[in-house]
């Protein structure tokens, strides 16, 4: 079992895909890492030699910000925006879309499920 940056890579996947299980590494970055150490992307994780795993681990830990560090970095950026009181910070604080999307309709993902408001009571019919 290959464990890199605190994540167990799935054994049956290709290395190229397995690396994308690490937060902060997508397909493009995965290909970039594999080309650095000249490793075939079609190799399965279970077939990786120990020295290749060590090389992957070293490159990822030294050259890239992943997992907890990246999550902390992103949350600190959002907190900074909220602290300085800018428009984007307020939108984050209010759980509204940040990048100019409309909110009169849509924006359900960001705003959460609808909250029903009680309407007028119907008059009893005689």
From Swiss-Prot:
- State the residue spans of region: Disordered: 100-126
* Compositionally biased spans, kind Basic residues: 101-126
Q: Which Gene3D superfamilies match?
A: 1.10.8.50, 30s ribosomal protein s13, domain 2
Subcellular localization is given as:
Plastid, Cyanelle
Which keywords are on file for this protein? Cyanelle, Plastid, Ribonucleoprotein, Ribosomal protein, RNA-binding, rRNA-binding
Instruction: Name one molecular function that GO assigns to this entry.
Output: rRNA binding
Which is a Pfam family this sequence falls into?
A: Ribosomal_S13
Q: Which family does it belong to?
A: Belongs to the universal ribosomal protein uS13 family.
Query: In its UniProt entry, what is this protein called?
Result: Small ribosomal subunit protein uS13c
Question: Which organism does this record belong to?
Answer: Cyanophora paradoxa
């Amino acid at each position: 079992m290959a464990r890199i940056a605190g994540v167990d890579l799935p054994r049956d996947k290709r290395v190229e895909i397995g690396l994308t299980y690490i937060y902060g590494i997508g397909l493009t970055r995965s290909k970039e890492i594999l080309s650095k150490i000249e490793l075939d992307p079609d190799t399965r994780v279970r077939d990786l030699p120990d020295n290749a795993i060590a090389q992957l681990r070293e490159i990822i830990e030294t050259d890239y910000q992943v997992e907890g560090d990246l999550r902390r970095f992103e949350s600190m950026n959002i907190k900074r925006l909220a602290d300085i009181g800018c428009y984007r910070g307020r939108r984050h604080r209010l759980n509204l879309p940040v990048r100019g999307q409309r909110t009169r309709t849509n924006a359900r993902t960001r705003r959460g499920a609808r909250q029903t408001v009680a309407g007028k009571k119907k008059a009893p019919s005689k």
